[in-house]
């Protein structure tokens, strides 16, 4: 694996000079191998190690290199044709392959090659970009978008129209992460490498970026870039210091543990916030 990483790192340093016409065989094979490993879930751009999320920047570099080494080509879909550098993940799938891998894909859902989809996942008409990892039992609902290299945990529900940001550039940025057992409400956006920790519930229409204040109304604490585990979050506003205006924020209205979450439905958690 180290040899593969070395090839990618070296090629990335000279990426400006690489084209589909002049790319060498070693680089092309290394990039294609990484994309295949991401596609199968054998590798992932970010993973939790000893309780901390670690981003493997060289894998992101491989994804970016894939755009340098490939020309656009006509790509056939179920009801459309495309013209792009990245093939569609399911282009060669037959019924036996879908049965073996154990997930559902509802037309016209689109998944790029290099994204991993785990068993018991349901993809409604949605979009999953290259490098993303969608774990077991997750629902990606209609018109939801999972951005490049985003990490989606087990038993997550991404509601209709949710946007999970992709982060390929700048390379020092970390991917957006939704941990296990989270619910993201309709039309919410989580971007810029924000981490929504395990068991959190994000209400409809909440927007979370690195500069968004995430205010805990019980403690007065303000978080940036991270929703603490078990949080129930709604849209809100905080007043300016001079009291002349207010600015958007996200508000943690309560905390729930796994036991409470198991007994109470998502809708109930969001309705009883007073």
UniProtKB/Swiss-Prot annotation:
CDD domains per the UniProt record, alphabetical: LbH_THP_succinylT
Recorded metabolic or biological pathway in which this protein acts: Amino-acid biosynthesis; L-lysine biosynthesis via DAP pathway; LL-2,6-diaminopimelate from (S)-tetrahydrodipicolinate (succinylase route): step 1/3
Subcellular location: Cytoplasm
Reaction it catalyzes: (S)-2,3,4,5-tetrahydrodipicolinate + succinyl-CoA + H2O = (S)-2-succinylamino-6-oxoheptanedioate + CoA
InterPro entries (UniProt xref): DapD_Trfase_Hexpep_rpt_fam (IPR005664), Hexapep (IPR001451), Hexapep_transf_CS (IPR018357), THP_succinylTrfase_dom1 (IPR023180), THP_succinylTrfase_N_sf (IPR037133), Trimer_LpxA-like_sf (IPR011004)
Residues annotated to bind substrate: 104, 141
Coiled-coil residue spans: none
A Pfam match: THDPS_N_2
Entry's EC annotation: 2.3.1.117
A single BP term in Gene Ontology: lysine biosynthetic process via diaminopimelate
PROSITE patterns registered for this protein in UniProt: HEXAPEP_TRANSFERASES
Gene3D superfamilies membership: Hexapeptide repeat proteins, Tetrahydrodipicolinate-N-succinyltransferase, N-terminal domain
Gene Ontology terms for molecular function: 2,3,4,5-tetrahydropyridine-2,6-dicarboxylate N-succinyltransferase activity; nucleotidyltransferase activity
First-tier enzyme category under EC: transferase
Superkingdom, taxonomy of origin: Bacteria
Keywords, comma-separated and alphabetical: Acyltransferase, Amino-acid biosynthesis, Cytoplasm, Diaminopimelate biosynthesis, Lysine biosynthesis, Repeat, Transferase
One Gene Ontology term, aspect cellular component: cytoplasm
Record-linked HAMAP family: DapD
Assembly behavior: Homotrimer.
Annotated family: Belongs to the transferase hexapeptide repeat family.
Name of the protein in its database record: 2,3,4,5-tetrahydropyridine-2,6-dicarboxylate N-succinyltransferase
Organism: Klebsiella pneumoniae subsp. pneumoniae (strain ATCC 700721 / MGH 78578)
Phylogenetic placement of the source organism: Bacteria, Pseudomonadati, Pseudomonadota, Gammaproteobacteria, Enterobacterales
Gene name per UniProt: dapD
